[in-house]
UniProtKB/Swiss-Prot annotation:
F-type ATPases have 2 components, CF(1) - the catalytic core - and CF(0) - the membrane proton channel. CF(1) has five subunits: alpha(3), beta(3), gamma(1), delta(1), epsilon(1). CF(0) has three main subunits: a(1), b(2) and c(9-12). The alpha and beta chains form an alternating ring which encloses part of the gamma chain. CF(1) is attached to CF(0) by a central stalk formed by the gamma and epsilon chains, while a peripheral stalk is formed by the delta and b chains. GO terms for cellular component: plasma membrane; proton-transporting ATP synthase complex. CDD domains: ATP-synt_Fo_a_6. The lineage of its organism: Bacteria, Pseudomonadati, Pseudomonadota, Betaproteobacteria, Burkholderiales. PANTHER family: ATP SYNTHASE SUBUNIT A, CHLOROPLASTIC. The keyword Cytoplasm does not apply. Coiled coil: none annotated. Its main location: membrane. The chain crosses the membrane at residues 37-57, 96-116, 144-164, 187-207, 224-244, 266-286. This is ATP synthase subunit a. It is a multi-pass membrane protein. Key component of the proton channel; it plays a direct role in the translocation of protons across the membrane. It comes from the Bacteria.
C-alpha cells in the first residue's frame, strides 16, 4: 500500500509521461498490432478543429476591410499558395496540392501546439475521468514517431501517384532504372546500371521519407522532454526550498521555453509543409 502511494522519482515521472494509451501492451519495438489511441484521438480531434476554423474563416469572409482573423487566414493562404506556385508548376496539380499543403500546415501546427499545455493537465484530467491514477495519456501526436512517419509515408504515396499520373507508368518505370547514372547501349552494362539506379532510387525514397518524419518527431519529442524537466524543477522547488525563489525560477523558465517553443512548433509545421511541396514538385519533374 505504502509502495503504491509514494511520490514518483524523476525517472519514473518521465517514463510514465512517455507512455501511450494503447489498445494492447507493446511487446516489441516494432509491433504493428499496437495502436496509440491517444495519438489517433488527439490528431483526429485537432484535424476536425482545423477544418472547422478554416471553414469558419471562409464562411465569415467579407469583401470589405477584413478583421484580424480574416486577415491572418488570408496571409496564411497567400503564403501557402505562393510556395505551391514556386514548387508545383502544373496548374492542374496545384488545385489539389495547394489546399493539401495548407491542411498539412494547420494540422501539424495544432498538433505541435498541444505541447504548450501544462504537462500534467490533460493526463491528470484523464486519470480522474477513468479513476486510474496510473492511466497513460500523451497529448502531442507529433511527438509520436508512428504519427510523423505515417504523415511522411502518405506524402511518399502521393509522390508515387503524381509520378505515375504525370509521366505514365512506363515513363516512371524507365526513370527508376535510368536515373541518376543513365544507361548503356551494352545490354550487360545496361542491366548493371539499371539495378544500381533502382537501388539508388529506393534508398532515396526511403531516406527522404524517414528523414521527413524523423525531423518533426525529434524536435517535438525533445521539446516535450524539456517541458517535463521544467515541471520536475517545479516539483523539486515545492519539496526542497522554502520561499519563492525556485518556484519563480520554474515559472520563468517555463515561460521562456514556451515562448521559444512557439517559434519551434510554427517552424516545424512550415518545414514539413515545404518538404511536402518540394517532394511533390520533384515527382512532376523528369530526371
Amino acid at each position: 500500500m505504502a509502495a503504491d502511494a509514494h511520490a514518483p522519482t524523476a525517472s519514473e515521472y518521465i517514463v510514465h509521461h512517455l507512455q501511450h494509451l494503447q489498445n494492447i501492451k507493446q511487446k516489441s519495438i516494432i509491433d504493428f498490432s499496437v495502436v496509440n489511441l491517444d495519438s489517433v484521438a488527439v490528431s483526429v480531434i485537432l484535424g476536425v478543429l482545423g477544418l472547422f476554423v478554416m471553414w469558419l474563416a471562409a464562411r465569415t469572409a467579407t469583401s470589405g476591410v477584413p478583421g484580424r482573423f480574416q486577415a491572418a487566414v488570408e496571409m496564411l493562404v497567400e503564403m501557402v499558395d505562393n510556395q505551391a506556385k514556386a514548387n508545383i508548376h502544373n496548374a492542374q496539380s496545384r488545385k489539389f496540392i495547394a489546399p493539401l499543403a495548407l491542411t498539412v500546415f494547420v494540422w501539424i501546427f495544432l498538433m505541435n501546439a498541444m505541447d504548450l499545455l501544462p504537462v500534467d493537465l490533460l493526463p491528470v484530467l484523464w486519470q480522474g475521468a477513468t479513476g486510474d491514477s496510473h492511466a497513460y495519456l500523451r497529448v502531442v501526436p507529433t511527438a509520436d514517431l508512428s504519427t510523423t512517419l505515417g504523415l511522411s509515408s502518405a506524402v511518399l504515396i502521393l509522390c508515387f501517384v503524381y509520378s505515375i499520373k504525370i509521366k505514365g507508368m512506363g515513363g516512371w518505370a524507365h526513370e527508376l532504372v535510368t536515373a541518376p547514372f543513365g544507361t548503356s547501349k551494352n545490354p550487360v552494362f545496361a542491366l548493371i546500371l539499371g539495378v544500381v539506379n533502382l537501388l539508388m532510387q529506393i534508398i532515396e525514397y526511403v531516406a527522404k521519407t524517414v528523414s521527413h518524419g524523423m525531423r518533426l518527431f525529434g524536435n517535438m519529442y525533445a521539446g516535450e522532454l524539456v517541458f517535463m524537466l521544467i515541471a520536475l524543477m517545479g516539483g523539486a522547488a515545492a519539496m526542497s526550498l522554502s520561499g519563492v525563489l525556485l518556484p519563480v525560477g520554474h515559472i520563468i523558465a517555463g515561460s521562456i521555453w514556451a515562448i521559444f517553443h512557439i517559434l519551434i512548433i510554427t517552424l516545424q509545421a512550415f518545414i514539413f509543409m515545404m518538404l511536402t511541396l518540394i517532394y511533390l514538385g520533384q515527382a512532376h519533374e523528369a530526371h
